[in-house]
């Protein structure tokens, strides 16, 4: 009989995910339920989403705030990947971005990048290596001082997705530079819309209901169900993530038989539990 494993926020930590799954006893064919926030912050986002999609039949995904944000921005990603050279320069921008870097934010500042046709060709055919060189190449290729519509997308992503709170620059770089198959895996993840996974048991287990969500459905991690004494609310195991801790946080409600588990141990590790260990 296959087992069910629940993984906390992964944040692109493929190595941490595999180490925790293997330590918990996961085997091929077992079910993996992810509480959300699979990408961003870590360095192996494409590898992580590819692994999950390869096991699509055995994976259940809860939408986290990071997935929701990428889903909203997917229309802009699609614009950037249409032209190979634009995709290349855009990928370079997000690969080399560091907090505190400056870049043009107004039409007047873009005018400072205007150059002759010969200089434009020289910039485009060059081999940029730094953030500012990629910015200049993107602006030159798209003639952003005349039409800044594409640059506005870059600017928006830099302002919204890079640095706190999403730290998604590595993910955007990987999405723009990876294979079509890997991009399809990213989009498969971001288009998941389930906000909750429910499992009910009729066997005489300690818990009759399992509720898996991205964050504590009642507030912060020490919040609890005020209706916990009502039938159907008691004897419930709540599993969630979103707020990171150095280890899995558990608190029990003796009066109702409910237990709350925050399994987000990012960024240093990926919290994984085998559900049968708690039943």
Please place each PLM-identified region on the residue numbering.
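Active-site glycine-centered loops adjacent to acidic/histidine catalytic or metal-binding residues
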Residues: 9, 36-37, 64-65, 241-242, ...
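Metal-dependent catalytic neighborhoods of phosphoester/phosphodiester hydrolases
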Residues: 41-54, 72-80, 249-252
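N-terminal active-site segment of His-dependent metallophosphoesterases
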Residues: 1-51, 55
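Residue-level marker for buried hydrophobic side chains located in beta-strands
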Residues: 6, 32-34, 61-62, 211, ...
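Short, glycine/acidic-enriched loop or turn micro-motifs at the edges of active sites
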Residues: 11-12, 40, 68, 217, ...
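Active-site phosphate-binding/coordination module
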Residues: 68, 75-106
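Acidic, His/Gly-enriched loop-helix segments that form or flank divalent-metal centers
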Residues: 97-261, 265-269, 278-279
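Active-site neighborhood of divalent metal-dependent phosphoester/pyrophosphate hydrolases
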Residues: 29-43, 61-72, 106-107
